[in-house]
Amino acid sequence: PHLNYNVCSYRKQWKEKIRLGYLGFVSDIKGYSEWKKLIQSLDKNRFDFFYFGSAIEEAESDGAKSVMVDFNCPNSLGMVEQLKKNRIDIAFLWSKCQETYSYTYYEAFEAGCWIVTSTHSGNITDQVLKNGNGRCFDTVEDCATFLKKLQGDIDVLRIDDVKINCNTDDFAPQSFGGENMKYRRGKRP
């Protein structure tokens, strides 16, 4: 053989939580009561909840980290910038009315967020289906079930054995303690 190598494996462990965001006006018609149900039904150790808008105190009392977004305040960052800055993975856009146009959908789309929405959200539903950038659900309970399963699927991907050539220092990963993994044969961080 042209190359002799030893294979060692280590377990990738990512501590990041899935970051969910509610965007815009706090109103039952925009799905805020469903947002609160979602917060209550998902594991806070696996999900971070963010609210983007101007109802900061209410959102924080309901369990979300609040980020001020107000287009009337010229000194504050806009929605797209705040979504990117806070690394939001999934935007929760659960309008109960048949939206004809949703600014928050396009802001979330521009920021690279995946969208979860109701099948009754009108244009939001249409755009998610057209662009393939999210999922539509009949109930918030269905959405919560999907997100719990999604978290489990991500955990499987995140905590997977990675095999490397331990003879090459350049590619040997570092453990969280800074120790070169090639010296930990048979051990896991």
Protein language model features and the residues they cover:
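Conserved catalytic-core segment of nucleotide-activated headgroup transferases in glycan assembly
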Residues: 3-75
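Short amphipathic alpha-helix with an adjacent loop that forms part of the alpha/beta core around
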Residues: 79-85, 146-150
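Conserved donor-binding/catalytic loop of nucleotide-activated donor transferases
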Residues: 86-89, 107-114, 130
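Nucleotide-sugar-dependent
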Residues: 91-103, 119, 125-126
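Conserved acidic donor-binding segment of nucleotide-sugar-dependent glycosyltransferases
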Residues: 134-142, 151
